[in-house]
From Swiss-Prot:
<feature type="binding site">
    <location>
        <position position="121"/>
    </location>
    <ligand>
        <name>3'-phosphoadenylyl sulfate</name>
    </ligand>
</feature>
<feature type="binding site">
    <location>
        <position position="247"/>
    </location>
    <ligand>
        <name>3'-phosphoadenylyl sulfate</name>
    </ligand>
</feature>
<keyword id="KW-0088">Bile acid catabolism</keyword>
<protein>
    <recommendedName>
        <fullName>Sulfotransferase 2A1</fullName>
        <ecNumber>2.8.2.2</ecNumber>
        <ecNumber>2.8.2.14</ecNumber>
    </recommendedName>
</protein>
<feature type="binding site">
    <location>
        <position position="49"/>
    </location>
    <ligand>
        <name>3'-phosphoadenylyl sulfate</name>
    </ligand>
</feature>
<feature type="binding site">
    <location>
        <position position="44"/>
    </location>
    <ligand>
        <name>3'-phosphoadenylyl sulfate</name>
    </ligand>
</feature>
<feature type="binding site">
    <location>
        <position position="184"/>
    </location>
    <ligand>
        <name>3'-phosphoadenylyl sulfate</name>
    </ligand>
</feature>
<dbReference type="GO" id="GO:0030573">
    <property type="term" value="P:bile acid catabolic process"/>
</dbReference>
<feature type="binding site">
    <location>
        <position position="249"/>
    </location>
    <ligand>
        <name>3'-phosphoadenylyl sulfate</name>
    </ligand>
</feature>
<keyword id="KW-0963">Cytoplasm</keyword>
<feature type="binding site">
    <location>
        <position position="46"/>
    </location>
    <ligand>
        <name>3'-phosphoadenylyl sulfate</name>
    </ligand>
</feature>
<feature type="binding site">
    <location>
        <position position="48"/>
    </location>
    <ligand>
        <name>3'-phosphoadenylyl sulfate</name>
    </ligand>
</feature>
<comment type="function">
    <text>Sulfotransferase that utilizes 3'-phospho-5'-adenylyl sulfate (PAPS) as sulfonate donor to catalyze the sulfonation of steroids and bile acids in the liver and adrenal glands. Mediates the sulfation of a wide range of steroids and sterols, including pregnenolone, androsterone, DHEA, bile acids, cholesterol and as well many xenobiotics that contain alcohol and phenol functional groups. Sulfonation increases the water solubility of most compounds, and therefore their renal excretion, but it can also result in bioactivation to form active metabolites.</text>
</comment>
<dbReference type="GO" id="GO:0016042">
    <property type="term" value="P:lipid catabolic process"/>
</dbReference>
<feature type="binding site">
    <location>
        <position position="45"/>
    </location>
    <ligand>
        <name>3'-phosphoadenylyl sulfate</name>
    </ligand>
</feature>
<dbReference type="GO" id="GO:0050656">
    <property type="term" value="F:3'-phosphoadenosine 5'-phosphosulfate binding"/>
</dbReference>
<dbReference type="Pfam" id="PF00685">
    <property type="entry name" value="Sulfotransfer_1"/>
</dbReference>
Length: 285
């Protein structure tokens, strides 16, 4: 088990699969192409679900690709050692993912036409999902208790830093033509309409039966049964034995876990931190 994080520019990262020098290269040297499509999220916000949907949009609903290539190769995380190497060698348009805050994201993006889809989620659910996820993997420092992780999360002393800072950093981009802001909650509530919105953003036309295939093959149950998407291929060096990295895939699970005192403290913190952003941005409020 790892007993500390890798720190880079004040942000915590796992100390397995990441290096400071690579993080610097990603920010300063990595070249984003105009044809690239990028999935941006804070961890535990529905990243893998969105990857699955985008892969299926690319294949018009045909599941062969998602059933034959691991999810981390179909849409590599650019900031990881493996992802940086894969993407640096890949020719043509690329699909890739990132959890990076805006100040560490590749500088080349801001003068490109590459399309970004930013998926956000109720931070209470992000917190709960993160607690179970980080306790299931071996490459990060683990909290001693639920309360300790709650304090870490509220302070931003967690992997990829503060949720509040991440949102604040990226939200000014939401009016740009090449930036699509989505929420996990709207994707869950009306998956069909949200997938149609993604297709419109990407300039992709689908037949009704292709859209139906995308919805079917990206369902939580389908992903849980697909060994290329459920992370069961990861070695025991990375995950605890019998860990389920796709846990529930629901909205509002925080109500089953947060104490009344924690919920009240979190509400107060949310109001303080997000007061300068329009409430309608957050469909869970």
């Amino acid at each position: 088990m790892s007993d500390d994080f890798l720190w880079f520019e004040g942000i915590a990262f796992p100390n397995m699969g990441f290096r400071s020098e690579t993080l610097r290269k990603v920010r300063d040297e990595f070249v984003i192409k105009d044809e690239d499509v990028i999935i941006l999220t804070y961890p535990k916000s529905g990243t893998n679900w969105l990857i699955e949907i985008l892969c299926l949009i690319h294949s018009n609903g045909d599941p062969k690709w998602i059933q034959s290539v691991p999810i981390w190769e179909r849409s590599p995380w650019v900031e990881t050692e493996m992802g940086y190497k894969l993407l640096s060698e890949e020719e043509g348009p690329r699909l890739f993912s990132s959890h990076l805050p805006i100040q560490l994201f590749p500088k080349s993006f801001f003068s490109s036409k590459a399309k970004v889809i930013y998926l956000m989620r109720n931070p209470r659910d992000v917190f709960v999902s993160g607690y179970f996820f980080w306790n299931s993997v071996k490459f990060v420092k683990k909290p001693k208790s639920w309360q300790q992780y709650f304090e870490w999360f509220c302070q931003g002393n967690v992997i990829y830093g503060s949720w509040f800072d991440h949102i604040h950093g990226w939200m000014p981009m939401r009016e740009k033509k090449n930036f699509l802001l989505l929420s996990y909650e709207e994707l869950k509530q009306d998956t069909r309409r949200t997938v149609e919105k993604i297709c419109q953003f990407l300039g992709k036309t689908l037949e009704p039966e292709e859209l139906n295939l995308i919805l079917k093959n990206s369902s939580f149950q389908s992903m849980k049964e697909n060994k290329m998407s459920n992370f069961s291929l990861l070695s025991v060096d990375f995950v605890e034995e019998k860990a389920q990295l796709l846990r529930k895939g629901i909205s509002g699970d925080w109500k089953n876990h947060l104490t009344v005192a924690q919920a009240e403290a979190f509400d107060k913190l949310f109001q303080e931190k997000m007061t300068d952003l329009p409430r309608e941005l957050f469909p869970w409020e």
